[in-house]
Regions:
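Short, structured coil segments at secondary-structure junctions
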Residues: 39, 59-60, 211
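Short phosphate-binding loop-to-helix
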Residues: 50-112
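A conserved hydrophobic position in a structured secondary element of the catalytic/binding core
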Residues: 47-48, 102, 181, 231
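Conserved core of the sugar-phosphate nucleotidyltransferase
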Residues: 103-195
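N-terminal glycine-rich phosphate-binding loop and ensuing alpha1 helix
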Residues: 1-47
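Conserved alpha/beta core of the MobA/IspD/sugar-nucleotide pyrophosphorylase nucleotidyltransferase superfamily
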Residues: 168-249
Length: 249
């Protein structure tokens, strides 16, 4: 099992996001340290940015430099897999660089789920939504699954819709952006044309479903789900405040 953390500097809403300081460390360092605790055989940061490379090398993270043309983290990982000579049958886990408190157990859980599952090309995770604000936020990605735990759709919309009721649906699930793939599948993914849905929702995983591949979704306990995914300046401010509270205990 290998973890690759794709990192780019040019975030639209938070430029330089991987290097933003949280509790005296760049965000990417928190993610790397969590990934190291998962028991993965290797943990590598994949980036095209020299500033990110230099920051990672200062705290000892291996870095794979990639091209700047990639449209998604998975495409960047595809190049890194080739450069790192990872075997086609090996499980590769994509840990997003904006999850500074991702649980090592969650990384391991998703990787092991794919290793056991031959019917799916990808594994990811979800958690029950417990607030109406989260349910209705376009910054929170929702997932709908079939009875076997395979994804039917991912969206930023509030789904499933409870017709005739204002009550939060008990089946509402928040997608957690960690992915496990077999290395050989990533090469196929990169060669697949992007789907119209992927472009509309700006969700790279929709390419997998559009082309008829299965995504296994592991539903995890609320306590294991990351609480500090950082996409906006408000998220960053909240993360810094929560970190202060954690260290003050």
């Amino acid at each position: 099992m290998h973890v690759i953390i794709p990192a780019r500097y040019a975030s639209t809403r938070l430029p330089g996001k991987p290097l933003l300081d949280i509790a005296g460390k760049p965000m990417i360092q928190h993610v790397y340290e969590r990934a190291r605790q998962s028991g993965a055989e290797s943990v590598t940061v994949a980036t095209d940015d020299e500033r990110i490379r230099q920051a990672c090398e200062r705290f000892g993270a291996p870095v794979c430099m990639t091209g700047a043309q990639h449209r998604s983290g998975t495409e960047r990982i595809g190049e890194a897999i080739v450069r790192l000579n990872i075997r086609p049958d090996d499980v590769v886990i994509n840990v997003q660089g904006d999850e500074p408190v991702i649980a090592p157990a969650l990384i391991r859980r998703v990787g092991e789920a794919l290793a056991r599952q031959t019917a799916a090309s990808v594994a990811t995770a979800s958690v029950s939504i417990d607030s109406d604000d989260e349910y209705r936020s376009p910054n929170v990605v929702k997932v709908v699954c079939d009875k076997n735990g395979h994804a039917l759709y991912f969206t930023r919309a509030a789904v499933p819709h409870a017709r005739g009721s204002d009550t939060l649906p008990a089946t509402a699930l928040r997608h957690i952006g960690v992915y496990a793939y077999r290395a050989g599948f990533v090469g196929r993914y990169v060669s697949m044309p992007p789907s119209p849905l992927e472009d509309v929702e700006q969700l790279e995983q929709l390419r997998v479903l559009w082309h008829g591949e299965r995504i296994l979704v592991c539903q995890v306990p609320i306590g294991e789900a990351p609480k500090l995914s950082i996409d906006t300046p408000a998220d960053l401010a909240r993360a810094r405040e929560q970190w202060k509270a954690l260290t003050a205990v």
